[in-house]
Regions:
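Tryptophan-centric aromatic hotspots in well-structured domains and transmembrane helices
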Residues: 9, 30, 44, 77-81, ...
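Active-site activation/catalytic loop segments of kinase-like enzymes and analogous catalytic loops
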Residues: 39-72, 82-104, 111-126
């Protein structure tokens, strides 16, 4: 139980604050709100900092502590960061599995894969698990690569400059990000899939027939696993997320080279 119970807004970013006359007039978007620990709110701010960077989040946490009188509890903040990162991944799961062509499709894919990586990193931080890096396949320039070169050049250099309406410019840029994802799937998707199956094989003890079948088996394993598997599973989640990010390389938008801000 927190020493000080607060209203946790739960999705705290600049878009949730309405300003007027130089002051905050209202706060909106409370569907994730709850009563809880102040450190949980800071964890949600830590998540949103990737998309709306403050420049020096640890210093802002210090300002918060000085102004509110609430000391920063790094251990609690790490714990709640897992929840905050996972909230986005869980929310976007159904969205990316059935993309709406009229929606922000590439942005949702980018946020989904980044949130998976951030969740794995938050789990590692909270449990003190050193993460091991993983090798990722690099694309060889093939015939398919040349086709994507032509498509991207046409869209970016021939079509986009002649679109005057800002909304349609935005939609074309979203399409270019989706094309980048498609290029990666075409160039390295098979290798990524093979790595994923081999990785799951080492944990499951049997080789799944497909990535989808393997993921179902991994879900069952996670549900039944004891704590002594935590380290191995966290390492797998991280490798899995890194592979997902590799398939979105060049289409990640603001999160292309983003990392979660440290706590202090």
């Amino acid at each position: 139980t927190p020493e000080r119970l607060v209203l946790v807004q739960g999705d705290t970013g600049p878009g949730q604050f309405l300003f007027g006359d130089g002051r905050v007039q209202a706060v909106v978007d409370f569907e994730l709100a709850s009563l809880g620990d102040p450190m949980r709110e800071l964890a949600h701010i830590r998540t949103r900092d990737v998309w709306y960077p403050t420049g020096n989040l640890p210093r802002w946490f210090e300002y918060y502590s000085e102004f509110s009188g609430v000391p920063i509890d790094a251990k609690k903040l790490s714990y709640y960061s897992v929840i905050a990162m996972l909230t986005t991944a869980l929310a976007l799961g159904p969205v990316v599995q059935k993309l709406n062509p009229r929606d922000e499709h590439a942005e949702w894919i980018a946020q989904d894969v980044w949130s998976k990586r951030a969740t794995a990193e938050a789990l590692a931080e909270a449990t003190g698990t050193p993460l091991q890096d993983t090798a990722l396949p690099q694309a060889e320039h093939s015939y398919v690569s040349g086709l994507f070169d032509a498509l991207e050049d046409n869209l970016r250099e021939e079509q986009l400059p002649h679109i005057d309406e800002s909304f349609r410019q935005h939609r074309m840029q979203m399409t270019l990000r989706l094309v980048a994802h498609m290029r990666n799937v075409a160039e390295i998707g098979a290798e990524i899939g093979a790595l994923e199956i081999a990785d799951m094989h080492s944990l499951l003890g049997h080789r799944p027939k497909s990535v989808k079948e393997g993921h179902r088996s991994m879900e069952a394993l996670v549900r039944s696993a004891d704590a002594d598997m935590d380290d191995a599973l966290i390492q797998y989640f991280y490798r899995h997320a890194k592979r997902e990010v590799a398939l979105m390389r060049g289409g990640m938008g603001r999160a292309e080279h983003a990392r979660t801000s440290p706590i202090n």
